[in-house]
A protein has these predicted regions:
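Active-site and channel-lining beta-strand-loop segments
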Residues: 31-57
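Alpha-helical scaffolding segments of alpha/beta enzyme cores, especially the outer helices
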Residues: 91, 118-125, 152-162, 180, ...
Length: 303
């Protein structure tokens, strides 16, 4: 037998091990950094909570959230990544903390996977291990655009609510799909797609949509969050439209530590004299808000 054929037989018997994916090392070493961005109650200027934003190690190939997500999807490790990010955020948050709630992102597909009782125990265990009460946690449902397993998603969000968590629906647009999911999941927090709150002062149609969505939020008992609020004028517009909560660079940049007070420039805007909008009549009747939305669904920035 030749040496070549012997080597081939040995390779078949003991195949070479596949090298671990680089993301595996990131998760095993805990090489993740958490930043916290404040979410502000617009009527009072108080800190409602902070969204936890996770990054990879600085100057690494997986520094950005998108790079981490792309690597996780390629390696079929998205749930592992998201649970690791959640654990890291809870660990860094600490207990007790003086600045309200912590907002944690979980994709709709991961929540579907966690709807199985055995998997859900892993999620529940994170709150216990890091001593953060579930009542101080808001789970943001992200990446729900292409989801089809609505029953499993609803099972998981219902189980989280039973623990005491609040549910937030992220990246909501004035589209029929977003509104259907809103009414189905009944989240206590609705976070608008950032395109709906950017450059508001130059797009009056957006302010009309904000007012209509604010009415719908009132009727469903949800708090509406405007994201990407980047200047004083846009802050005034979202406040005057009746939006409850806001986040963005004008209100506070993501930082390694949570803050207990709003920055001075935003406090000055919110301290200006203004008249809060009247709430819509007949809470629970969605017809008026839905009628207004029908005229706006499908506009260019809501696809």
């Amino acid at each position: 037998m030749s040496d070549v054929s012997l080597v081939q037989r040995l390779l078949k018997r003991w195949p070479a091990k596949t090298p671990p994916h680089p993301l595996q090392a990131v998760l095993e070493q805990g090489a993740l950094e958490t930043l916290y961005q404040p979410i502000i109650a617009l009527q009072s200027g108080a800190i409602d909570g902070h969204e936890a934003l996770v990054r990879g190690q600085k100057d690494s190939d997986m520094e950005t959230p998108q790079a981490l997500l792309d690597a996780a999807q390629l390696a079929q490790m998205q749930m592992e990544l998201e649970l690791a990010c959640m654990g890291r955020a809870l660990q860094s948050w600490g207990y007790p903390h003086t600045a309200g709630r912590i907002y944690l992102n979980l994709s709709a597909h991961t929540l579907v996977a966690l709807s199985e009782p055995k998997s859900f125990k892993r999620l529940e265990g994170l709150f216990l291990v890091h001593r953060v009460p579930a009542k101080r946690v808001v789970v943001e449902v992200t990446q729900h655009r292409k989801l089809k397993e609505f029953n499993a998603l609803e099972r998981c969000t219902t189980a989280l609510q039973a623990l005491g968590c609040a549910i937030a629906l992220d990246d909501v647009k004035a589209s029929r799909r977003s509104l259907d999911l809103w009414l189905r999941l009944k989240p206590s927090v609705v976070k608008l797609d950032s395109r709906m709150t950017q450059d508001l002062q130059n797009d009056p149609d957006k302010a009309k949509v904000l007012r209509t969505l604010s009415n719908l939020a009132f009727k469903t008992g949800a708090s509406l969050v405007a994201k990407a609020v980047e200047d004083a004028e846009d802050l005034r517009i979202v406040r005057d439209a009746g939006v409850h909560l806001a986040q963005g660079h004008f209100l506070g940049f993501p930082a390694p530590a949570a803050v207990d007070t709003l920055n001075l420039r935003a406090r000055n805007v919110l301290a200006e004299k203004w008249t809060p909008p009247e709430p819509p009549s007949r809470p629970g009747d969605l017809s008026a808000a839905d009628s207004g939305l029908q005229k706006l669904v499908g506009m260019r920035w809501f696809d």
